Structure formats: structure tokens, C-alpha cells
UniProtKB/Swiss-Prot annotation:
This is Translation initiation factor IF-3. SUPFAM superfamilies: Translation initiation factor IF3, C-terminal domain, Translation initiation factor IF3, N-terminal domain. The keyword Protease does not apply. Its main location: cytoplasm. The keyword Cytoplasm applies. Belongs to the IF-3 family. It comes from Nostoc punctiforme (strain ATCC 29133 / PCC 73102). It comes from the Bacteria. One of its GO terms (molecular function) is translation initiation factor activity.
Amino acid sequence: MPVIEKKRTRDLPQINERIRFPKIRVIDTDGAQLGIMPPQEALQLAEEKELDLVLISDKADPPVCRIMDYGKYKFEQEKKAREARKKQHTADVKEVKMRYKIEEHDYNVRVKQAERFLKDGDKVKATVMFRGREIQHSDLAEDLLKRMATDLEPFGELQQAPKKEGRNMMMLISPKK
């Protein structure tokens, strides 16, 4: 015989007959307080208006319920959750690579690219790569990264100053809030 799992009552929203408190504070559709009463009485008021009795806060003493259209309430809650998810943007780290002997136009392209990343709310890791004996010119690479930091100042702030990491020199710029 298959086992039938009973749905947890905690997962179900507490509306109408599911509200199990001896006394509740009731709020009308227009926000006016109707006072403290037993849930049966409040449910009767809600049914007269062809609406639902929805538990808003069970933490309060007595618990707060509101007379409203539950479908509309659920839709509003889902809409708020969607908006909150949209606003929740995780800042990725985007990398812009170049060599210390970069031409002016190529440099401007990298700056524009970094600017776009910062405007999108992402951090930018600017990296200057060295090959062979080029590593001796780390001072030129540092100057290049500092120049890039000043060019990007309106869009972001320097989070990590230029520093050597193996055969590269890098810095980190985070977007302005």
C-alpha cells in the first residue's frame, strides 16, 4: 500500500478556517481596526463581504488578521518577491587584460570596456601581462594602471592598488554606489 504524504499545515497559508487562535485582532479592507474577536466572528464578517480572512502576523499578541481578497494578496507578495530578486545583483569580477606597451586606441577600448562593466555594477580587475624580460618594466605597467584608475574615477573607486602577481600586475576597481 503506497504511503500518502500529508501536506504540512505549516506550508499552507493561514487563511479562513485554518486560523487557529482563540482571539485575533481584525483589520478591515480599508485598514480600519475592527477590534479583537474570535476567528469565527471575523470569518463571518469576511464571508459577508465575499472576501478572505488572512493572517498577517502571528507574532503579535493577539495575532493580526485582515479581511481581504487572498488571491490579490498572494499576487502582491509574489510581485514583491520578484522585484526583490531583480534588485539582488551579485557583483561579478570582470577582467580587462593588456600589455604595458599598449597603443592609445587599444587603451581607450579597454577603458570603455571597464567603464561599461562598472556601470553594470561589476568589479573590474585590470591586468597588465608581462612576457620574458618585460617584467623589468613593472614601473611602466604601474603607471599605466594608475592612469586607468584616474580615467575610471567617475565610475568606480580603487579597491586594490596595483600590485605584482607572478608575471602580471593587477588592480581592482569597484563600482561607485
